[in-house]
């Protein structure tokens, strides 16, 4: 049974998974195209960070960064290697979507890579209703970046 916790990023396992996430991004994308946030940036007041646990074992992480009062960005979505293909990413994504709805956000966006190693990520987001979009916030067109967005219904229910 998995438990999702709002996290302060002090647990060593959480810090290690954030570092693993950043390292993985840099292995697949050039540094100028990698937009992963480190622990310090994930502690910004505009970011809410969650961890997923199975007992004492960290299974995954994810974050929601508020861009403005109606637009949020998914950040730092990562499943721990021992938990791949067990539904952790879908679980944290559904949790973040619910939080976005609860906060009355109208749009949720994300930036991810274009390389083959990101295929599972693309499939996850498309399965949950995200669609390709133009760069948002401070992002620019980049052959190493893919931008996706989900418009939440006007009555703020998930589609």
UniProtKB/Swiss-Prot annotation:
GO terms for molecular function: acyltransferase activity, transferring groups other than amino-acyl groups. Its EC number is 2.3.1.-. Keywords: Acyltransferase, Transferase. It is an enzyme of class 2 (transferase). Residues 4-153 form the N-acetyltransferase domain. Pfam families: Acetyltransf_1. Belongs to the acetyltransferase family. This is Uncharacterized N-acetyltransferase YedL.
